[in-house]
Amino acid sequence: MPATPSLKVVHELPACTLCAGPLEDAVTVPCGHTFCRLCLPALSQMGAQSSGKILLCPLCQEEEQAETPMAPVPLGPLGETYCEEHGEKIYFFCENDAEFLCVFCREGPTHQAHTVGFLDEAIQPYRDRLRSRLEALSMERDEIEDVKCREDQKLQVLLTQIESKKHQVETAFERLQQELEQQRCLLLARLRELEQQIWKERDEYITKVSEEVTRLGAQVKELEEKCQQPASELLQDVRVNQSRCEMKTFVSPEAISPDLVKKIRDFHRKILTLPEMMRMFSENLAHHLEIDSGVITLDPQTASRSLVLSEDRKSVRYTRQKKNLPDSPLRFDGLPAVLGFPGFSSGRHRWQVDVQLGDGGGCTVGVAGEGVRRKGEMGLSAEDGVWAVIISHQQCWASTSPGTDLPLSEIPRGVRVALDYEAGQVTLHNAQTQEPIFTFTASFSGKVFPFFAVWKKGSYLTLKG
C-alpha cells in the first residue's frame, strides 16, 4: 500500500481562518473551511446574490443555492486527522491510491477519476474483512483450545495410567519381596532344624561313647587289680575271670545318622540351585522388560486383493471377491497375505494374534523377510524367507523345509510371536495355554516384518494390543 504523506494528526487546537485564534465552538461549512461560530456571519447577513445563491464561506466565496442552504457542520473532537497539505480535516478516502483526502484534495486533478468515498463508507469493506478474519481467527483459536483440551485430557489419562502402573510395579515387587522373605525364613528355619538335629545326635553320640569309655575304664581297673592278686586267689575264679576278660565287640555309634546325612545332602543340593534360579529369574525379567510390545498394524500396501482390512488396520479377513486395488510391487498377488508394520532390524519384539477359522479355512502367522516373494506362486518356508506356523482346523505345522508337523494338544485360537533379532530366533506360543508351538533359528539380514495369511470365507485374524 502506498504511503500517505498528506496525513497528519493535529494535537493542538486548530486556528480559525478568520480570526487566526483558537477555534471556539467550531463549525465547518460545506466547502470544508472551519471557523469559530461567532466569526461566521449569519446567513441573513451574507445576503442573496443576483444568481439566487447565498455566500456560505467568507474565505473562498463559495456559493450554494439559496433554497437549499447547508447548515454548518460541527467540528469533531480535537486531535483528529488533518490534511498536511491544506490543513483541512480529512473526510474522504481514495480507494485507488489508498490515501486520505480533504475537500481540496478530493477536488484536485489527481483524484478526479479515482474512486473516492467518505471515510465511514470506505472503511466498511475493510471492517468486514477484518471481522471475517477475526471470526476465522476466533474459530481457529477455539479449535486449538479444543485440541489442547483434548490433548490435556489424553495427557492426564496417560499420567493416570503411569501412576497406576507405578503402583502396580511397587505392589508386585513388594509381593515378590514378601515371597522371597517368606522363602528365606523357611530355608533358614529348615537349616536351624537340621542344625538342632545334628547337635542332638552329637549329644547322643557323645553320651554313648562316654558310657563305653567309662565301662572300659572300670574293666581295665578291675583287671589291673586281678593281675596283682596271688596265684591262689586268681585261680579260684579263673573261669569267671576269663569270661569277663574276653573282648566284647563294641559297635561304635555314628555321630550323624545316615537319614540325617541324606536330609542334609538333599537340602544342600536345593541351596546350590538358588544362585542359578536367581540368575535365571533376573535374566528372564530383564528379557521380558526389554521386549518391545509396540503397536503392530497391517500394511494395506502389501495386502492381497483377496483380503479386507479393518479401518484400524488391526484385523484382516478373507473374501472371495477380489478388491479393485492399484497394483504395487509391495502387494501380494499369489497368496492371500499381508505384512505387518513396522519392520524390525534389531531388538526383541512380540505381538499376539487371535485366530478365527472358517469352514475349511486356515491361516499363517509368523515373520517374513523384506525380500520375500510377493508376485506369483510363493513358497512358505524358511528358505523362502518365511518363518511361520500354518494353522488349520485339523493340524498345525511349521514352515521348515520340509514342513514340520506339530503334535499340539489343541489347535491354537491365539498365537503369541516373539522375535529376537540378534539371537536369530522366532518363537511362537499358544496365547491361551502358553504352550510352546515352535521356535525357528535363523540368521536375519535386513528387515523382517510380521507376516499373516488367511484363506477361506469366515476366516480372519485380529492383532491384539
Swiss-Prot record:
The chemistry this enzyme catalyses reads: S-ubiquitinyl-[E2 ubiquitin-conjugating enzyme]-L-cysteine + [acceptor protein]-L-lysine = [E2 ubiquitin-conjugating enzyme]-L-cysteine + N(6)-ubiquitinyl-[acceptor protein]-L-lysine
Zinc finger motifs (B box-type), residue ranges = 78-119
Q: Which UniProt keywords are listed?
A: Cell junction, Coiled coil, Cytoplasm, Metal-binding, Nucleus, Transferase, Ubl conjugation pathway, Zinc, Zinc-finger
Main localization, broad class: cytoplasm
- Could you tell me what this protein is called? E3 ubiquitin-protein ligase TRIM15
What InterPro entries does this protein map onto?
B30.2/SPRY, B30.2/SPRY_sf, Butyrophylin_SPRY, ConA-like_dom_sf, PRY, SPRY_dom, TRIM/RBCC, Znf_B-box
Highest taxon of the lineage:
Eukaryota
Coiled-coil regions, chain positions: 126-229
From which source organism is this entry?
A: Pan troglodytes (Chimpanzee)
